[in-house]
């Protein structure tokens, strides 16, 4: 998948990310912009999770939505 495809894919899934993690702000979503490590970091920040817990949540979300970064 090239960068343009990944960006388009992110736009499609952005709403689903907000549904899953409602504490993420629009500014957070702009920072994340399809970057998995940024999503994990923002989940840690907003929810007070340890990195491994945030990683597990993202892993689970990826599997449910068949999302590839």
UniProtKB/Swiss-Prot annotation:
It comes from the Bacteria. Transmembrane segments: none annotated. Pfam families: CsbD. InterPro entries: CsbD, UPF0337_stress_rsp, YjbJ, YjbJ_sf. NCBIfam families: PRK10428.1. Belongs to the UPF0337 (CsbD) family. This is UPF0337 protein YjbJ. It comes from Escherichia coli O6:H1 (strain CFT073 / ATCC 700928 / UPEC). The lineage of its organism: Bacteria, Pseudomonadati, Pseudomonadota, Gammaproteobacteria, Enterobacterales. The gene is yjbJ.
